[in-house]
Amino acid sequence: MLLIKRYLMDPESLRRQIMNVYKCYMWKRAFHSNRSLLEVKRREKSLQRKILERILRPKEENAVKKSGFKLWSSHLNNPHKTYMRLEELQRRIMEEVHVEGIKKNDKLFNEINQWHFQNENTSTVRTPTLLIHGYAASSMSFFRNYPGLSKHIRNLYSIDMPASGLSSVPSLEINTTTPLPLDIKFIGENKFKVPYTINANHNKFVIQMYEDFYLDRIEQWRIDNKLGKMNVVGHSFGGYLSFKYAVKYPNSVNKLCLVSPLGVERNIWSVNNNFHSNTLYTIDFKNPNSKFYSKRNMIPKYLFEQQFHILRMMGPLGAKLCWNYIMAAYSRVPSLAYKEYIFELFYGKGGIPEVTTDIFKALFSRCILAKDPLMDSLQYLNVKKLLIVYGQYDWMNKKAGMFMVKELNNLKNCLEGASYLEIPSSGHNLFLDNPESFNQSIVSFLSDETKSP
């Protein structure tokens, strides 16, 4: 009561006290808001920073330490030795993969290394289904998924893409003149202009030739296996190629599943933009549906050009850093043989052939944005059904996937519609991080069984 009387006698003192309480409240609110914002920013770290952290600070739990010198000295060999190691490691990995039905490995016409899982006792997914791996990977990427998927898919196929894994390395032939490339001049923090216009049709024609290195061989593989329409499930760069394959060969694809696909976003590097020369444009760093979109971070030119070759140039240190990265990036994968397989791909001489990196550099900018984005070709896609799926903690731009699904459903060129999904407790390699949830989602999407109302 005395305190109340005091404030009644001195209203200015009461006002100051109320203001102090309000300021304290606002400070606490700002603190918690900033802490939440920092947490969001922490989760949205750039790809470059994530890679650097994995190289320098690999997780200790379940990590197998190896000497950089021993790793380096054991890889002073020719590509044939790398191939033999990959072959042996594939054998070790697949020995631990137990499936219902038949598990068969072939090198079709001595070109495409394929795995075929046949289970005549299931009728859930009767349409043949092909798994397509991402960049610098192989059919071994899905080794944790083969048992669960083949239990419900009658004929499941997985291949090493051309110039990947144990598949042969065809020569790359681009029989045309090199087009004048898109040149972007950045001005300040958020402006850009192009000093000259490009021949968009010529650029797109050349991009198509690079893509056809893969697309035409996938189609020939389908014909050689005497398959009709098939389901296609593609991850990352494999998702990008799966989409382009469905556009070029619409009569070959039934359902299409894009797993954390690369190259979805519209962006300033797209050859489809038709920018005017010497006109100042503003970059949109937030909206992946805008042709003015770009990322803030760009891979240094030398690193982008050299890629995995840099690791070998660094000697024992490069070998050690490569192993550290693999231990961190695949910490949730228990198989040591798989990690050794990935090391052989990344570090082994000829593990990632030059033709593979050349094509990737021709199709993507140093921001890892496509020069012919998927969003620019949605009107040409005609499949029965589409699913785009990401990991909960995926570094890919999930907002772009949401835009893609929305636009496809507006266009109505997917007979049964397009849908978006996230796999919990997983990142970009969601099928490795959470195989059970991934398998269940894929089987549900691909199912040929009629669902009761």
From Swiss-Prot:
Keyword Transferase: yes
Annotated EC: 2.3.1.-
Protein name: Protein ECM18
Main location: mitochondrion
Additional observations: Present with 143 molecules/cell in log phase SD medium.
Organism (species): Saccharomyces cerevisiae (strain ATCC 204508 / S288c) (Baker's yeast)
Gene name for this UniProt entry: ECM18
UniProt KW keywords: Acyltransferase, Cell wall biogenesis/degradation, Mitochondrion, Transferase
GO biological process: cardiolipin acyl-chain remodeling; cell wall organization; lipid homeostasis; phosphatidic acid biosynthetic process
Domain statement: The HXXXXD motif is essential for acyltransferase activity.
A family per Pfam: Abhydrolase_1
Lipoprotein among keywords: no
GO cellular component: mitochondrial inner membrane; mitochondrion
Family: Belongs to the peptidase S33 family. ABHD4/ABHD5 subfamily.
Alphabetical list of InterPro entries matching this protein: AB_hydrolase_1 (IPR000073), AB_hydrolase_fold (IPR029058)
Span of the annotated motif HXXXXD motif: 428-433
Subcellular location: Mitochondrion
Job of this protein: May be involved in cell wall organization and biogenesis.
Cross-referenced SUPFAM superfamilies: alpha/beta-Hydrolases
Domain AB hydrolase-1: 130-435
MF (Gene Ontology): carboxylic ester hydrolase activity; lysophosphatidic acid acyltransferase activity; phospholipase A2 activity
